[in-house]
Amino acid sequence: MTFAKQSCFNSIILLSIATSYFKIGHKISELGNRIEKMTTFLIKHKASGKFLHPKGGSSNPANDTNLVLHSDIHERMYFQFDVVDERWGYIKHAASGKIVHPLGGKADPPNETKLVLHQDRHDRALFAMDFFNDNIIHKAGKYVHPKGGSTNPPNETLTVMHGDKHGAMEFIFVSPKNKDKRVLVYV
């Protein structure tokens, strides 16, 4: 995507967010206090408050390392989003540069496919970060879920791909400086 297209896309996203906040009674000035663009962020399971981590917490996990939910916060669980095609992009583990993949790298992974980190970059690893509906969607249409679908999964719960939509599969993107402050990841 060219710089001009990316800038236009970012402006459209911000305008959409501003319009949504205005429609529900928030002042536009409050928007700046609530949403910040951030290149590095945490992925927080909305219901439980736990965060997406590479299993074991390594700064350079091996290919096919599972992604789990855990309550700890540290720099080895920071993520970045690299836009590739409009809303689609790679969810990158900031410390290692590896990206989130469905295990096996299938174009249409079945329900319960584990999420892992891997170095390869291809269209089967593209996701969109849906700020409005609080979910992470794979290009094939399935969503990131905690395995088992619990609203309060224990530490070390695997994350998987699944087609269902419900409150237990909602994720938000927050600042590493303030785990309660939402951030915009499309920068």
Curated annotation (Swiss-Prot):
Q: Lineage from the top down?
A: Eukaryota, Metazoa, Spiralia, Lophotrochozoa, Mollusca
Q: Which residues carry this modification: N-acetylthreonine?
A: T39
Query: By what name is this protein known?
Result: Alpha-D-galactose-binding lectin
Q: Does the keyword Transmembrane helix apply?
A: no
List of residues binding N-acetyl-alpha-D-galactosamine 2: E112, H145, G148, D164, K165, H166
Q: CDD domains attached here?
A: beta-trefoil_Ricin_MytiLec-like (cd23417)
Acetylation as UniProt keyword: yes
Q: Write out the tissue specificity statement of the associated record.
A: Highest expression in the posterior part of the mantle. Highly expressed in gills and to a lesser extent in mid mantle and anterior muscle. Lowest expression in digestive gland and posterior adductor muscle. Scarcely detectable in hemocytes.
Biotechnology note: This protein may have potential for the development of new diagnostic agents or treatments for cancer since Gb3 is a cell-surface marker expressed by several different cancer cell lines.
Superkingdom of the source species: Eukaryota
Regions annotated as coiled coil:
none
